[in-house]
Curated annotation (Swiss-Prot):
Role this protein plays: Mitochondrial GTPase that mediates the disassembly of ribosomes from messenger RNA at the termination of mitochondrial protein biosynthesis. Not involved in the GTP-dependent ribosomal translocation step during translation elongation.
Entry protein name: Ribosome-releasing factor 2, mitochondrial
Organism per entry: Candida glabrata (strain ATCC 2001 / BCRC 20586 / JCM 3761 / NBRC 0622 / NRRL Y-65 / CBS 138) (Yeast)
The organism's taxonomic lineage, starting at the top: Eukaryota, Fungi, Dikarya, Ascomycota, Saccharomycotina
Gene name tied to this protein: MEF2
A Gene Ontology cellular-component term: mitochondrion
SMART domains, per database record: EFG_C
Length: 807
């Protein structure tokens, strides 16, 4: 046996590799409590980034640095950190991993959504005991276009099952998987059950055993499996897994088949080199045809180095990543083997996405950006293509959690931060920034297409909870407005509505915890003297029938005709094919439709004094202000409606200020809404897609409570046991050739015989706010609830009076 101690970089090394192929932009995603932050902490220690391992429960991890994160033991906001890792199987040069640790709680799903927009790959962490949970499936859907590797964590826990989890993964995600390593258990004198202490490396046919008592990820013993007795169980399982791997790769990769039969291996799966296997797995992973699966126990420091190797081996560099989505769609985006994405055939065009905005008490405003093409230099003039505004940026930094490292420039594939007073109020989350890669003021050399360019648009989920925000005194009103502006700029999934009639300010968010964190920040971090109402469900209204068309026309040249109607965003393509342009108004799926807009842009050079961008922004502002409290049932915001501007619109060519344009269009929208009475308005409420896991003996009680007390609609009832006979055939077709190693501990784990069933139900959110405690009572603590926002639904007539009374 050999003693192997993982080589680690010194924490003082600050110089990063500059070639693009050496970067890995990856995210850590998982269901809450699967071990994301713990895994990240071990990665940083193994890489020499930190000298001491922090602990989530102790509140001293690197990436969970906010006070509320450390108090609650959960990740609230995404944290970015860069570090080097040397994969011993490749050349001697280190790779740079730009890692983003994301939240797992459903209330902070927007943090995950915006992070996924800038990542080239992801590590999906699975709880080896819980398996593939509801939030895991949701994260898989969000990241379906991103190459991933899976890490089955917590294999040291009683009831953990690697193959059980692997079966769930292949069944629930419909993705082909390949086992790169799997758990190794050893019988000890201290325990009746086998103890997890290492992994079996299928690629290199090695057994890696960690000394778990040493409490260090570095103390690893390496055993050559081929030197063991043929009857040794570890060797037998490894050979079966390698044969399975070769069959899977042979089915998906023709080049591998040729190398397998014509190369040195001569058709023997044990003779295929690690290099050939890794090359094929990498190719298929980047093509999103295969997902490598690894095992470990992060808290016990087991399996971290192979996971880091897997990130380098299998996940793409920016040169290999999928091309960004660009609008307008006629702007060409091609792959350049040297620089990655080349946008609009412009070698010197730097394109960056601002995916996160935050305020630091010391550094001020910080804008996190991902560079897609070109080079962004400190001190350069840039343009925000959303607003059309040009401004000079200050210092550029790379973040190491809450520590900043200043750099002179950011290259393609890098994730960095804009800082300085010059960017204040200039950039919001989701904005695209363009610049010239060489000239400081070269932005002037770009044309109209570049100035309209948008990259990887970020969709903001609609908020479903709200809370009233009131100043403690009238003198504090401006302070509160500024604080709310700051907090919503950082987190656009928070939304502020001000009722112009009552003056009431309402803060909307994704969940109760989401709003609790926002309240904490306003009071404790921003020191705003404010009172809050009770957190409540956010209701909306919509139109049943379109309003009448109303018109404004005068001798000065103003001519606008418009109406308001219910609208489904799925019909946007139909509108655009007819020559109209559709613009999102807000987070409530409201839209502005400008008929004939595309023809206007094509047939003329836009002779108006007011720029195109300002014209659209003005009409959008009118729509937003008019719709936010226009409902007649409960004076609520309108949802899923469209303001349709008829194609004969016009205004004076020499009009320079948009103020009159704003006033006219806003009055018109209000007038249009007055043409229909209250009977044309419908009250809407958020409904949730609930996944409720309950013991079989409690199904009847729980379903009766859901249908009667919660007015839920039951969609289906599923068996959580993937191995049940009715699922075996489907699982077999999805996991063809995949070998499932023996789950050594499941036979001895103290698991109750009462199998769990999953109830899928559509439920009004209002009826589910306190349901978790009720479910625990009905199931003696064994029931589990997970909910996803499904959409807005009409409120039944019998429930409307109670809801209006609550409002």
């Amino acid at each position: 046996m050999l003693r192997f101690v993982c080589g680690r970089f010194q924490s003082g090394i600050r110089r990063y590799a500059t070639t693009i192929d050496r970067f890995r932009n990856i995210g850590i995603i998982a269901h809450i409590d699967a071990g994301k932050t713990t895994t990240t902490e071990r990665m940083l220690y193994c890489a020499g980034k930190i000298k001491r391992i922090g602990d989530v429960d102790s509140g001293d991890t690197v990436t969970d640095f906010l006070p509320q994160e450390r108090d609650r033991g959960i990740t609230i906001q995404s944290a970015a950190i860069s570090f080097q890792w040397h994969d011993s199987s490749r050349d001697n040069s280190p790779r740079v991993i730009n890692l983003i640790d994301t939240p797992g709680h459903a209330d902070f799903i927007f943090e995950v959504i915006r992070s996924l927009k800038v990542l080239d790959g992801a590590v999906l962490i699975l709880d080896g005991v819980a398996g593939v949970e509801a939030q895991t499936e949701k994260l898989w859907r969000y990241s379906r276009n991103i190459p991933k590797i899976c890490f089955v964590n917590k294999m040291d826990r009683v009831g953990a099952g690697f193959s059980k989890t692997l079966k769930e993964l292949t069944y629930k995600t419909d993705r082909r998987c390949v086992v790169v390593n799997f758990p190794y258990f050893e019988q000890t004198n201290q325990s009746e059950d086998p103890v997890f202490c290492g992994v079996i490396d299928v690629i290199n046919m090695k057994l890696l055993k960690w000394d778990t008592k040493a409490n260090s990820p570095d103390a690893v013993t390496v055993v050559d499996l081929l030197e063991l007795n043929d009857s040794d169980n570890a060797k037998v399982e490894a050979i079966k897994s390698r044969e399975s791997m070769v069959e899977i790769l042979g089915e998906l990769d023709d080049v591998f088949v040729q190398e397998f039969f014509d190369g040195p291996s001569e058709g023997n799966s044990l003779k295929v080199s690690a290099q050939v296997l890794n090359k094929s797995i990498r190719k298929l992973t980047i093509a999103n045809e295969l997902t490598p699966v690894l095992a470990g126990a992060s808290f016990k420091n087991v399996g971290i180095q192979p996971l880091l190797d897997g990130i380098i081996q299998y996940l793409p560099s920016p040169l290999e990543a999928r091309l960004p989505e660009v609008n307008p769609k006629d702007i060409p985006v091609v792959h350049d083997p040297k620089v990655g994405a080349l946008i609009n055939k412009q070698n010197n065009l730097c394109v960056a996405l601002a995916f996160k905005v935050t305020h630091d008490q010391i550094r001020g405003l910080m804008v996190f950006v991902r560079i897609y093409s070109g080079v962004l230099n400190s001190g350069n003039t840039v343009m925000n293509t959303t607003t059309g505004e040009k401004f000079r940026i200050g210092k550029l930094v790379i973040m190491q959690a809450d520590q900043a490292q200043e750099v002179k420039s950011l290259s393609p594939g890098q994730i960095g931060v804009l800082t300085g007073a010059t960017i204040t109020n200039k950039v919001a989350t989701g904005d695209t920034i363009i610049s010239h890669s060489i000239k400081k003021d070269g932005i002037r050399s770009f044309g109209e297409k570049e100035s309209q360019l948008k990259v990887n648009a970020i969709q903001i989920p609609p908020p479903v909870f709200s809370v009233i925000v009131e100043p403690k005194s009238l003198g504090n009103k401006k302070l509160i407005e500024d604080a709310l502006k700051e907090i919503t700029m950082e987190d656009p999934s928070l939304h502020v509505i001000i009722d112009e009639e009552t003056g009431q300010t309402v803060l909307n968010g994704m969940g109760q915890l989401h709003l609790e964190i926002a309240k904490f920040r306003l009071v404790n971090e921003m020191k705003v003297p404010v009172d809050f109402g009770k957190i409540a469900v956010s209701y909306k209204e919509t139109l049943e029938l379109p309003t009448e068309v109303v018109t404004f026309k005068d001798e000065r040249g103003f001519h606008f005709s418009l109406s308001v109607e219910s609208f489904e965003k799925d019909t946007i393509n139909i509108e655009e094919r007819s020559g109209a342009s559709c613009f999102s108004v807000d987070n409530d799926e409201n839209y502005l439709i400008i008929e004939g807009f595309q023809d206007r842009l094509q047939k003329s050079n836009w002779a108006y004094q007011i720029p195109i961008r300002n014209f659209v922004t003005t009409i959008l502002s009118s729509a937003m202000a008019s719709l936010q409290s226009a409902g007649k049932v409960g004076h609520l915001p309108l949802y899923s409606c469209a303001v349709r501007l008829k194609k004969d619109w016009d205004f004076p060519l020499d009009l320079q200020s948009p103020a009159e344009l704003l006033s006219i269009t806003r009055s018109l929208i209000t007038e249009a809404l007055q043409t229909v009475d209250v009977s044309n308005y419908t009250l809407l409420e958020p409904v949730m897609d609930a996944h409720i896991s309950v013991p079989q003996n409690d199904i009847g009680t729980v379903m009766q409570d859901l249908c009667s007390a919660r007015t839920a609609t039951i969609s289906s009832l599923d068996d959580e046991n993937v191995s049940s006979s009715d699922k075996l055939m489907e699982l077999e077709s999805q996991s063809k050739h995949l070998y499932y190693p023996t789950d050594s501990t499941l036979g001895t784990a103290k698991i109750q015989d009462d199998k769990l069933k999953t109830i899928h139900a559509i439920c009004p959110l209002k009826e589910m706010v306190t349901y978790s405690s009720k479910l625990r009572s009905l199931t003696k603590g064994r029931g589990e609830l997970h909910m996803d926002y499904k959409g807005m639904s009409k409120v039944s007539q019998e429930r409307i009076p109670d809801i209006l009374q609550e409002l």
